[in-house]
Amino acid sequence: MTSIKFYQSFSAHLVQHSPWPILVSFSLFNLAIGTVLTMHGYSHSSTTFDLGLAVTVGSILLWTRDIVIEGSFLGDHTKQVQEGLIIGFILFIISEVFAFISVFWAYFHSALSPAVELGSTWPPVGIIPLDTFSLPLFNTIILLSSGAFVTYGHHAIFSGKRLDSIIGLFLTVALALIFSYFQAFEYIHAGFSMSDSVFGTVFFASTGLHGIHVMLGTLFLFVSFLRQVNYQTTKEHNIGLETSILYWHFVDLVWLFLFLVVYFWGGA
């Protein structure tokens, strides 16, 4: 660790070229195309979807492996590289904000001025929305609790309480998996589908987009948990953990807005 700190004190950019960003971009595009084709019932569309999903997941895992090797074993994450990672993460969050803005825009566009075909009311005639204060409220408590535990684990690292930090990260990942399970349970037992008017479309699009981000954030936090277990995170060397925690708080904030708008206000 001493030699890694020594090399990381230099301002040179040591990270080599990586194929994973471009591979993830193309595989995500392929996954999106496969999703659309599958929803429209095109033949062999599931092959496109499965291929896109497999390449995306594989590329993300291999990308994560390379980052861990570069940062923890090779000492390639110098000050300049760390600054680049932080700037890249900020740009990533900004792009995510605009992605959710587009979804909420679609929701408000339909909800604030319902079309005549929908009965000029929101939710549309014939749609029975989910009970806000049952499973959605329970999921909200779970997700916000996970945010509290990840903050506890974060502070434990800087306080030198390694075991407490591991427990905090473990509970965060566990609660994230529970949230995803109940979200899937909610989808299965919902009284409407994505094809049931624009209400179903924007509901599943907004909550589904958030669900994808929950799964991605769970992966980030699980990697941070494993790195903490293997003594790869310190007070000075924690860019991956910091960005994972900030991303998780972003996911928490988006869900809180989703709960208030889609479930509480939109489902009333």
Curated annotation (Swiss-Prot):
Enzyme class: translocase
Catalysed reactions, as listed in the record: 4 Fe(II)-[cytochrome c] + O2 + 8 H(+)(in) = 4 Fe(III)-[cytochrome c] + 2 H2O + 4 H(+)(out)
Record EC number: 7.1.1.9
GO CC, alphabetical: mitochondrial inner membrane
GO aspect biological process, one term: mitochondrial electron transport, cytochrome c to oxygen
Sample GO molecular function, one term: cytochrome-c oxidase activity
Classification via Gene3D superfamilies: 1.10.287.70, Cytochrome c oxidase, subunit III, four-helix bundle
A Pfam family recorded for this sequence: COX3
Recorded topology in the membrane: Multi-pass membrane protein
Keyword Endoplasmic reticulum in record: no
Entries under SUPFAM superfamilies matching the protein: Cytochrome c oxidase subunit III-like
Cellular localisation: Mitochondrion inner membrane
Transmembrane region(s): 19-39, 49-69, 85-105, 124-144, 165-185, 202-222, 245-265
Signal peptide: none
Coiled-coil region list: none
Broad class of where this protein is predominantly found: mitochondrion
Keywords for the protein's UniProt record, in alphabetical order: Membrane, Mitochondrion, Mitochondrion inner membrane, Translocase, Transmembrane, Transmembrane helix
PROSITE patterns per UniProt: COX3
Assembly: Component of the cytochrome c oxidase (complex IV, CIV), a multisubunit enzyme composed of a catalytic core of 3 subunits and several supernumerary subunits. The complex exists as a monomer or a dimer and forms supercomplexes (SCs) in the inner mitochondrial membrane with ubiquinol-cytochrome c oxidoreductase (cytochrome b-c1 complex, complex III, CIII).
Family as reported in the entry's similarity comment: Belongs to the cytochrome c oxidase subunit 3 family.
Primary role: Component of the cytochrome c oxidase, the last enzyme in the mitochondrial electron transport chain which drives oxidative phosphorylation. The respiratory chain contains 3 multisubunit complexes succinate dehydrogenase (complex II, CII), ubiquinol-cytochrome c oxidoreductase (cytochrome b-c1 complex, complex III, CIII) and cytochrome c oxidase (complex IV, CIV), that cooperate to transfer electrons derived from NADH and succinate to molecular oxygen, creating an electrochemical gradient over the inner membrane that drives transmembrane transport and the ATP synthase.
Protein name: Cytochrome c oxidase subunit 3
Organism of origin: Schizophyllum commune (Split gill fungus)
Gene (name only): COIII
